[in-house]
């Protein structure tokens, strides 16, 4: 039998079981755990497109039509990184969804084929490339529509939050207030190759106006201190959420005017809630909002400007806060408000709480103390910093492999951090039946990366099975690669293909009320569901519940008695090596 060297094989078909890959210029190393393309019984039946390759008529391409089972698109030899594993596989796409993860080819000439390639099948060659699920940013201030293209080009395919544009309320708070604005934003969502959903304003002490917003299609409600996050408003908002199976996101009371963190926790009454920027620099009970990380009903997230803690973090935050919350540096009380939120001790602890899996979600806080295009970059920078400062991260003790074998890779840490911007926000907001992972039946939102550019600059962004964005060269060139290469919208982002390739998430009440027809919407509407039963224990790889202690005088943070502190990073990967600015 003919053989091929491991290096030559990886160069031709991509890495296989036991091969290791470095992610960008970080210190993170992944190792391939399984190879689904070997279901034919071993090596030698791989598929590959190109001159002299195997995906040709009568070889790995069958005669079968779409009706006879051939897929619309096959992504060949992809290195999948997802919360459930790091595997090599072919991926079959059909009707905008993922229909198979396994071995592609021609079942008439090859064994073990579970993805049929036919004359009607397109090929995206992923040999040597990484494929991840599209990212999910759950903390969006919809200040300008250009945010969406910026996020898409970074690998984000789902965005939820609130706003109406550059209105003063939207600059500060993440809500689309009232049924009229919700209708307008849902109509605007039809223009974008992005899964979108909007949260209504949750600050009210009586339920009628909140139900009105949910019935109008808001997928949840947002409580923000700038609108008055009192215990009465919290309780009322959660009452409505419980009745409508929607999520509540909260920005708590920095000034402790209407109560302390203990009062807010009491108002939760054990009900599930998504706490935004749980460290507190983005807002929340000063100085101890981070205590909520240890509560079983709290689904905690971070926003990216504090990720990770660096020598520049503190200096940039005060100015950001003054602008975002309509404060005046000439007013002493406004300045004191800003400075009370920026604490190096809690920001440093936030790094470690992410590494421990105690903070479950990463998000941006776009243009409102956060950078919409940097959710993914800053997640991996945090992972890199934590490996550099805390060493290798051991997987759960149920893993039976020898420690020496496990220490060859960072697979567990990589799965933990990936889950923070994929499956966990999807679970939190009731969308995991559609998005958040590479699994059968889910919407085909996939991001292709060259390993050297992983987390920094994707090669392709696939939305609902169509390529919606890509790093593309000069359109007048004779080939696709000449400079200037930059992100450009592709055919999946135009015309009717745009509407077929993306989802708009709404409440079940709104869907039942027929808002799609009433508002004249063209995108497919999907109702959020199974939200109210979600707890911290359901956060994949990120469900640690420490007993939190925060000293009100020194701001020192302890988790289960351990002092959490680390040095700021002086330099980071995924920065100047990739960007001019």
Swiss-Prot record:
Entry binding sites for substrate: 224
Post-translational events: Carboxylation allows a single lysine to coordinate two nickel ions.
InterPro entries reported in the protein's UniProt record: Amidohydro-rel (IPR006680), Metal-dep_hydrolase_composite (IPR011059), Metal_Hydrolase (IPR032466), Urease_alpha_N_dom (IPR011612), Urease_alpha_subunit (IPR050112), Urease_AS (IPR017950), Urease_asu (IPR005848), Urease_asu_c (IPR017951)
Pathway: Nitrogen metabolism; urea degradation; CO(2) and NH(3) from urea (urease route): step 1/1
GO cellular component, one term: cytoplasm
UniProt-annotated location(s): Cytoplasm
Cofactor note: Binds 2 nickel ions per subunit.
The protein's enzyme class: hydrolase
Urease domain residues: 134-581
Positions of the catalytic residues: 325
One function term, GO molecular function aspect: nickel cation binding
Residues that, per the record, bind Ni(2+) 2: 222, 251, 277
Modified residues (N6-carboxylysine): 222
PANTHER family: UREASE
HAMAP family on file: Urease_alpha (MF_01953)
NCBIfam families: PRK13206.1, PRK13207.1, urease_alph
Subunit structure: Heterotrimer of UreA (gamma), UreB (beta) and UreC (alpha) subunits. Three heterotrimers associate to form the active enzyme.
Protein name: Urease subunit alpha
Source organism: Albidiferax ferrireducens (strain ATCC BAA-621 / DSM 15236 / T118)
Recorded name of the encoding gene: ureC
